[in-house]
Amino acid sequence: MNVQYQAFTPPHLLNNTRRSPTRNISSLSSAMSGRKRKAEDDGSAGDDDRMSASPSASPAVLPRPAPRGMKRMRTNISGRPLPLPRLLETLSPDEMRNLLQSICQRHPDISNEIVTTAPRPSIQSTLEVLAKYEASFQAAFPFGGRASSDYAYNRVRQQLDELLDSLKDFTPHFLPPNEQQPATSLAFLDGATDIIHRLPNWDTFQHNRHKQEAYEEMAKAWAIVIREAAKKAGGIQLQYGGWDEKIAKHNEISGGKMQEAVNELRGGLGWMGAETSNSAAGAPADAMSIRQQLLSGNYGAGSPASIGAW
């Protein structure tokens, strides 16, 4: 028997026409990424469910109330005048003063209401106003030369008149009967007299009449206040306030132009000294005083009325 042997060929060396299907790498990667995104979405959804289950643990989702006191901006903004309070905030003191004076001139009833309702000026505020006028007067002097020359006088004449006019206007406000407290009147006159002392003595005699007149008016004001102060509480304000020394000093600085005030003070202190000596003399002085009151018909005029028949 003739047997034919064929050579053995390994399978991997055979020409295999059946090939395994090729896989698309791009589609595989997209599918994997899709699964990954789906897993992430599922996880995020679970987190959202867990967060929504306890809203108190997430303060970001709570509504915040609008802070009080804040005004919402108007959506329909248009031009309009300022409210009166805002307008007054923009005015300077001079502008405010000019505005009030203009309104009062047109409406006298408003002027009277302002005078009656405005707070009374204090000594400090009034002296501060006078100090501003004095500073303006001093600043008007020219540089160089004598401060008492005619040229300097002509340069500061307007400021000098404004200062003296302010003294004339403010002084009556602190005199009785408008001012009932002697201490207040005396304190203002003390500061106002110092301002007159600081006025220069001009080279020309006629130019000094402003200062002379200011001294005369101030001396009369001192006399009025001293006379009224001597009537209240036995003149204790004059006795123990040291005003005798202050007025004597003012008279010395002015060159004797405050003599009227000095004489009034001497008369008041002399009367009070005589009353003190009479009260210390004892009963005879008291009896003589009663006799003089009986003869003049003034006995009991100053005593309080009694209650009852006797």
From Swiss-Prot:
Alphabetical keyword list: Cytoplasm, Nucleus, Protein transport, Transport
The organism's place on the tree of life at top rank: Eukaryota
Annotated spans, Disordered: 1-85
UniProt xrefs under Gene3D superfamilies: Tethering factor for nuclear proteasome Cut8/Sts1
Cited Pfam families: Cut8 (PF08559)
GO cellular component: cytoplasm; nuclear membrane
Single GO molecular function: proteasome binding
GO process terms (BP): nuclear protein quality control by the ubiquitin-proteasome system; proteasome localization; protein transport
Subunit structure: Binds the proteasome.
The protein's name in its UniProt record: Tethering factor for nuclear proteasome sts1
Species this chain originates from: Pyrenophora teres f. teres (strain 0-1)
Gene: sts1
